[in-house]
Amino acid sequence: MSTAMNFGTKSFQPRPPDKGSFPLDHFGECKSFKEKFMRCLRDKNYENALCRNESKEYLMCRMQRQLMAPEPLEKLGFRDLMEGKPEAKDEC
C-alpha cells in the first residue's frame, strides 16, 4: 500500500562528482592503457587490488593528457607504488 504512493516521486537525485570532471577520451589517447587495465581485471577475476600498476599507469596517462585534473599519486592511493620517488614540485 505504501509503495503505490511512491510512483510519482523521484528516488534518485544525480549529483556532480566530488572532484572536477572526468572527460571522455574521444581521441583514444589512453586507449592502450585502458585496455591493458581492463585485460588485467578480466585475467585476475576483477580483483582490482591485483591490477594497481595498470590502474596507476592509466591515471597517469589521463593526467598527462589533461583528461583529468592532476593529482599527486599518493592522494589517489598509490603511495606504496611510488618506489621512493616523490613527484617533482615547483618551488618559487
Swiss-Prot record:
Cysteines paired by S-S bonds: 30-61, 40-51
UniProt KW keywords: Acetylation, Cytoplasm, Disulfide bond, Mitochondrion
Residue ranges of the motif Cx9C motif 1: 30-40
GO biological process: intracellular copper ion homeostasis
Domain of life: Eukaryota
Region (Disordered): 1-20
Motif (Cx9C motif 2): 51-61
Compartment list: Cytoplasm, Cytosol; Mitochondrion intermembrane space; Mitochondrion
Positions with biased composition (Polar residues): 1-12
Subcellular location, principal: cytoplasm
Any Gene Ontology CC annotation: mitochondrion
Modified residues (N-acetylserine): 2
CHCH domain ranges (all copies): 27-69
Family, as annotated: Belongs to the COX19 family.
Stated role: Required for the transduction of an SCO1-dependent redox signal from the mitochondrion to ATP7A to regulate cellular copper homeostasis. May be required for the assembly of mitochondrial cytochrome c oxidase.
Subunit composition and interactions: Interacts with CHCHD4/MIA40 forming transient intermolecular disulfide bridges.
Protein's name in the database: Cytochrome c oxidase assembly protein COX19
Protein source organism: Mus musculus (Mouse)
Recorded name of the encoding gene: Cox19
